[in-house]
């Protein structure tokens, strides 16, 4: 974990990089069209980027404001920035090949096909053209390094340079993103209806989020300990809201699909025991198939399987058997399955098999926070690892990345540090009384965290907050382009800041 109170001595001023993040409406549903994170945008709103300066000759490289994991740290040689072509190319959705005999790298994406030969300053295209680079491609510990200008001048990506932190910011082209939302656990202050339809229930207004969403997962059903399903009031809060038919009708009017979502866990459902009993398991599958008749599809959200290592294999087998039964009963009705990521503590999910039997997987790549060590809920390294592990086993076009619209707030009092709360994105900065603050450190977006960091001290102790907002949510949504996956699902509607639909621009 970075300590920004110490790091600020070496950082100098926080960087404000000129990158525009625009969320554009698209003519054809269903998807958001996220404009590229474009350098040199018009001034609208400024935010701070908190970036640790790279030490010469090295440089930082960010794609759409998120880090790029490089096996060899990019560096400057003879005045030119050298970057690993495989790491950056694959992050941009290209296929990279290697001919070891001739020492030739192939770069392929869509209609673009390039041949780069180690030791030369030329590039061959598939149509026979020869292009020049300012610096020869080279091998460094088995990694091919090429001038960054290959991506900016030849491939046409927008690139910005920040001298204060020796950082390169690359913007990928605009592409549509398929967005889903969880319609669950709503309240007066955090209303799913208001986030989705733009006004207080039962009213709607335009523009609203529903105009650009593929669908919602209606978290209105809970599996009880006896294996029965209820949509009435229960301890988990997964229940039908009053006026729920209006949600379905209004969603249909906006061409938004509505999937019924069924939640279970160990604490409230003892889901492992239910799945282990063949009769209960079969009855549960039948009940869900009947309840799902009035919906466009089903999302199964059975959480906590395999937390006990001794039961991981049996949980996996039993869950597979349940999905088999349910899939047969549903017929042509689509079935999605929410899963914990492979790099989590929950090992009771057969990801490869689920990826085959389900129409899609919702990858819950968050919840990585520690209860006593200040950490964000979904930092880049964990999310990046989770998605890459998933698409090794599952078709990327079946993977929906679930992203959190909430952060984490920690308090340190004396020698005790604890997770205080998980503030929703729409709350903005943590509220505090100025006359109680002893020391305040500037809020800023940290690419490694994929969220904002804010720290202050008051009479209660030291506060460390990892906060989501419109910018961080858009950065997370853009990750779907990097991995070539189906789309993203926001947990949850009711937490989203209104400006997630508005253009936000970062200026120097």
Model-assigned labels for residue ranges:
Residues 405-478:
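Glycan-binding loop/region signatures in secreted carbohydrate-active enzymes
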Residues 197-205, 242-247, 283-288, 341-352, ...:
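Alpha-helical scaffolding within the catalytic cores
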Residues 12, 29-177, 181-187, 193-211:
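Primary recognition of N-terminal secretory signal peptides and signal-anchoring hydrophobic helices
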Residues 18-27:
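Bacterial N-terminal signal peptides
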Residues 476-508:
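Acidic/aromatic/glycine-rich contiguous surface patches that form carbohydrate-binding/processing clefts
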Residues 216, 300, 361, 401, ...:
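Conserved, mostly hydrophobic/aromatic
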Residues 173-286, 376:
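Glycan-recognition patch characteristic of GH18 chitinases/ENGases
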